[in-house]
Regions:
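Conserved HGGG/HGGXW glycine-rich cap/lid loop of the alpha/beta-hydrolase fold
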Residues: 21-75
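Short aromatic-enriched loop/helix-cap "lid" or pocket-rim segments at secondary-structure transitions
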Residues: 74-77, 139-143
C-alpha cells in the first residue's frame, strides 16, 4: 500500500460482540499487512491512537478497540468491568478477526489488559509493548 493510497483517509468504524456487549473498534485498513492492535487506557477511547495509526498504517493492519464502557462501545449492564472481562473482550476481537499472532501496543489500563492477555494466551501474541501497564503494586492493592 502506498502513501498515496492512504493519504487523508481515516479509519472505518466496526463492531464485534463479546459477552452480549456490542463493542466498537476502528480498522485502519491494509488487511494483508501484519496485524497491530492499539489498546487505549482508562477513561480514553480508540481515536486517541490516530496519530500513531496514521504513521504506521502503511506497514501494519491496525485495529484499535474501544474497551467496554469507553468510546463508542456499550456499557456493561451488570457493571462488569473486571480485568477478566476486558481480557476476554480482547481475546474475542483477536479470535473473531483472525489476528493471531498479533502485535499489541497498549497504554495504562490497556497495557494491564494486554499483559494479562499475553499471559493467558501466549500463542496469540507475537509482540507486546505495554506503556505504564502494570497498575498498582500488590501491596497497594491489598491496602485498598
Amino acid at each position: 500500500m502506498s502513501a498515496f493510497d492512504i493519504a487523508g483517509s481515516g479509519p472505518t468504524s466496526r463492531v464485534y460482540f463479546s459477552q452480549r456487549l456490542r463493542l466498537h473498534y476502528v480498522d485502519w485498513g491494509n488487511p494483508t499487512a501484519p496485524p497491530l492492535l492499539l489498546v487505549h487506557g482508562g477513561r480514553d477511547h480508540c481515536r486517541n491512537w490516530d496519530w500513531l495509526a496514521s504513521a504506521l498504517r502503511g506497514d501494519w493492519h491496525i485495529l484499535a478497540p474501544d474497551l467496554r464502557g469507553h468510546g463508542d462501545s456499550q456499557w456493561s449492564p451488570d457493571g462488569n468491568y473486571s480485568t477478566a472481562a476486558y481480557v476476554y473482550d480482547l481475546a474475542q476481537l483477536i479470535h473473531q478477526q483472525e489476528l493471531a499472532p498479533v502485535t499489541i501496543i497498549a497504554h495504562s489500563l490497556g497495557g494491564n489488559i494486554a499483559i494479562r492477555h499475553a499471559g493467558v494466551y501466549p500463542d496469540k501474541v507475537r509482540k507486546l509493548v505495554a506503556i505504564e501497564g502494570l497498575g498498582p503494586s500488590p501491596k497497594r492493592m491489598a491496602a485498598r
